């Protein structure tokens, strides 16, 4: 048993408190009009309070809304093929390889992404928000760092719209392998480099845009290192955050001398892009 899938059959308007409760143990979520799915690694399962989840669901009128099942690594492709379809995010269309390519009449930049055990498909609001804010900020020739790259979707997207080079880093070796496969699928091996590790493995240079779509706790822990990787005038893009966490994150980033430049919200989630002063 590698991962546990929790399915909460509740409408989107009721997702927020459960997202907050499962934010730390879960490594990813899938939301749609009828349910919320959370994916928790087996080693984090002890942090999930099933009794509290069931009590809260019952209090909200959903006593039978929770189902739990273990997932083996080999089952993930079937899981995603059953649930994924092309998703538009800003100028991008994120499309799994199990789905036929879109019509040539669509002017979107197509990203062919298969997630396997990683997250970052465009089916979660945090990825869509990050893709939109990235597209608005990226300039041709930029150097991009994607921390917690997952599927590699942000690094790949950056190269597809003009970045000179993008580096994705992730502490999960399965994510690193998956991201490298997606880089090959999108024919971006000359532009995207994927490495195992955290932001420290990218300490040899500075970047024009640093992106991190991870949890609030990890973002706060990594904040000094993320800011240190920014070139003068660069942008810091943070996603993976619930709306109530906005002010805490904004204040933490401001303490490093960066100002909120743009923000977006969707389905209870928030993302912000911060600008570093052009002067050292």
UniProtKB/Swiss-Prot annotation:
List its EC numbers: 2.1.1.-
Q: Which residues cross the membrane?
A: none
Record-level GO BP terms: methylation
Protein's cellular compartments: Cytoplasm
Catalytic activity, as annotated = L-lysyl-[protein] + 3 S-adenosyl-L-methionine = N(6),N(6),N(6)-trimethyl-L-lysyl-[protein] + 3 S-adenosyl-L-homocysteine + 3 H(+)
Q: Name one GO molecular function term.
A: protein-lysine N-methyltransferase activity
* UniProt keyword annotation of Cytoplasm present: yes
Annotated S-adenosyl-L-methionine binding sites? 127, 148, 170, 213
**One GO term of the cellular component aspect?**
cytoplasm
Keywords, in A-Z order: Cytoplasm, Methyltransferase, S-adenosyl-L-methionine, Transferase
A Pfam family this chain is assigned to: PrmA
Describe the family membership recorded for this protein in Swiss-Prot or TrEMBL: Belongs to the methyltransferase superfamily. PrmA family.
| Function (record text) | Methylates ribosomal protein L11.
Q: Which HAMAP family match?
A: Methyltr_PrmA
Under which name does UniProt file this protein? Ribosomal protein L11 methyltransferase
Underlying gene: prmA
């Amino acid at each position: 048993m590698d991962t546990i899938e929790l399915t909460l059959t509740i409408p989107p308007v009721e997702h927020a408190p459960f997202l907050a409760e499962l934010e730390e143990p879960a490594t990813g979520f899938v939301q749609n009009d009828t349910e919320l799915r959370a994916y928790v690694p087996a080693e984090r399962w002890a942090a999930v309070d099933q009794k509290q989840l069931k009590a809260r669901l019952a209090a909200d009128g959903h006593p039978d809304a929770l189902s739990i099942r273990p997932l083996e690594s080999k089952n993930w492709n079937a899981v995603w093929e059953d649930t994924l379809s092309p998703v538009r995010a800003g100028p991008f269309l994120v499309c799994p390889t199990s789905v036929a390519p879109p019509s040539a009449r669509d002017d979107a930049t197509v990203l062919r992404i298969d997630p396997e055990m990683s997250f970052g498909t465009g089916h979660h609001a945090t990825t869509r928000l990050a893709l939109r804010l990235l597209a608005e900020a990226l300039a041709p020739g930029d150097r991009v760092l994607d921390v917690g790259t997952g599927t590699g979707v942000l690094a790949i997207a950056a190269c597809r719209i003009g970045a000179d080079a993008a580096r994705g880093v992730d502490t999960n070796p399965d994510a690193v392998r998956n991201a490298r496969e997606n880089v090959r699928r999108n024919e971006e091996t000359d532009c995207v480099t994927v490495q195992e590790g955290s932001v420290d493995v990218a300490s040899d240079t500075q970047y024009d845009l640093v992106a991190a779509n991870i949890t609030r706790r990890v973002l706060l822990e990594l904040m000094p290192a993320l800011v240190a990787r920014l070139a003068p005038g660069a942008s810091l893009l943070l996603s993976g955050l619930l709306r109530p966490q906005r002010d805490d994150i904004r204040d933490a980033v401001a303490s490093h001398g960066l100002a909120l430049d743009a923000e977006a919200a969707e389905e209870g989630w928030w993302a912000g892009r911060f600008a570093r002063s052009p002067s050292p």
